[in-house]
Regions:
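Solvent-exposed, amphipathic alpha-helical segments
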Residues: 36, 40-48, 94-98, 132, ...
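Hydrophobic/aromatic-rich alpha-helical bundle segments in the mid-to-C-terminal region
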Residues: 3, 143-147, 162-213
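Helix-turn-helix
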Residues: 33-36, 40-82
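N-terminal intrinsically disordered/low-complexity leader segments
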Residues: 1-32, 213
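An amphipathic alpha-helix signature
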Residues: 38, 111, 151-158, 162, ...
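Hydrophobic alpha-helical connector segments
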Residues: 82, 96-127, 175-178
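Short, basic, alpha-helical segments at the C-terminal edge of helix-turn-helix-like DNA-binding modules
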Residues: 85-92
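Amphipathic alpha-helical packing segments from all-alpha helical-bundle domains
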Residues: 92, 122-130, 138-165, 173-176
Length: 213
């Protein structure tokens, strides 16, 4: 069995519990909340790797004692689990809710989905995504979460095509192709010229929703 970062077999199951609601941004004179620790740990994950996420390093970074950390997490492992739960919620479940509300038709939702990676905050999210997946290549626990996230996303994309009138098997193939385009565009659009964004969106959407003659 592959090595786990948490060292607990039950950690993958704890990820299925509902995540706490994200706290609002704290004032400078207010105590740290759980989200502050998660954000700091994510910053280290992107800048270094998961091995760089150490309690003493986090405390130094945030200017607090270890007691503040242990107020929110029993162990470093609990923080790692919380990071993955937070990533799944913010970058998958919340995105699905946002896309669902963003358009009245499945085609409009697909277009908004394709446009996600060009939004201002997308580069930062792409860095987190890449770092999580790099971690998952070597460790079992995050790999299970990444696999679950991929299935959730693919299932949602597939349902968009089913709602647009495509058969289930065809919808699954189009969903996979859509996922490949979104993931690839999130990496490549900053270094390669794919043409005007609006033109790219319309041509890609037309290709993905085109029916055989």
């Amino acid at each position: 069995m592959a090595k786990t970062e948490t060292g607990k077999k039950g950690d993958a199951e704890t990820l299925k519990r509902p995540a706490k609601r994200s706290p609002t941004r704290r004032r400078k004179d207010s105590p740290l909340n759980e989200q502050d620790w998660i954000d700091a740990a994510m910053e280290i994950l992107v800048r270094e790797n998961v091995r760089g996420i150490r309690i003493d390093s986090l405390c130094s970074m945030l200017g607090v004692t270890k007691g503040s950390f242990y107020w929110h997490f029993k162990t470093r492992n609990d923080l790692l689990v919380a990071m993955l739960k937070n990533w799944r919620r913010r970058m998958t479940l919340n995105v699905i809710q946002s896309i669902t509300r963003s358009g009245r038709t499945s085609k409009a939702r697909l277009r908004n989905l394709l446009a996600l990676v060009r939004r201002p905050k997308s580069p930062a999210f792409a860095q987190i995504e890449s770092s999580i997946r790099d971690w998952a290549r070597r460790v079992e626990m995050p790999r299970e979460v990444v696999s679950e996230v991929d299935e959730i996303r693919l299932d949602y994309f597939q349902q968009l095509y089913i709602d647009a009138g495509f058969e289930k098997d065809d919808a699954r193939k189009r969903a996979y192709l859509t996922y490949c385009i979104v993931m690839g565009d999130s990496i490549l659009h900053r270094t390669l010229d794919g043409g005007p964004h609006e033109e790219f969106l319309e041509e890609t959407l037309d290709m993905l929703t085109r029916r055989g003659s």
